Regions:
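Short, surface-exposed acidic-centric catalytic microdomains
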Residues: 30-91
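Short, hydrophobic/glycine-enriched beta-strand segments
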Residues: 19-25
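Internal catalytic-core helix/loop-beta-alpha segment
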Residues: 70-118
Length: 164
């Protein structure tokens, strides 16, 4: 598989009431095809959030945004553009980071969370020097992280509830 230069095509989802910010790396091939975050049907992000928040699993983009806004959750990614093979985070190179300061200036974000180790490492390298706000790295909800069962993910991700 060849490297492809990808530029992030989604706006961040947040408003002035957002209390936590969850950052991924970059939308996957499937997410870009579906025009929204965590669009791969095997990605457990939406199912996990719905479970933790005692909500129905959202199906449409509007339902997903509604659940985020209702629960004061902002989402975006750490990468504005990069070179990547398919959806493989391990292949990411030539990163141009997003500027999350616009979210932090608008919303009273209590905690930043990284969805997976790669997002956490990139946040630490690029955004932490700009924000001074440490991120908590959580296990990835990606289907590539099959070693983590849904139950284990739920246990690890319950910590987001403390800041909501």
């Amino acid at each position: 598989m060849e490297y492809e230069h990808i530029t992030h095509s989604f706006e961040p989802v947040y408003d002035e009431n957002s209390r936590i910010l969850i950052l991924g790396t970059l939308p996957s091939v499937k997410s870009r095809e579906n025009n929204f975050y965590y669009g791969h049907k095997q990605n457990r992000f939406w199912k996990l959030l719905a479970y933790l928040l005692d909500e129905s699993v959202p199906e449409t983009i509007d339902e997903k945004k509604y659940m985020l806004f209702k629960n004061h959750i902002a989402i975006w990614d750490v990468i504005q553009s990069c070179d990547i093979k398919g959806s493989s985070d391990s292949s990411i190179k030539n990163v141009e980071p997003t500027d999350i300061r616009k979210i932090l200036e608008t919303a009273d974000i209590k905690q930043v969370y990284a969805n997976g180790n790669k997002a956490g490492a990139l946040y630490k390298k690029y955004q932490l020097p700009l924000t001074g706000m440490e991120a908590v790295t959580l296990p990835s909800t990606s289907p590539a992280n099959a070693a983590w069962s849904f139950e284990r993910l739920c246990e690890a991700w319950t910590r987001i509830l403390a800041n909501l």
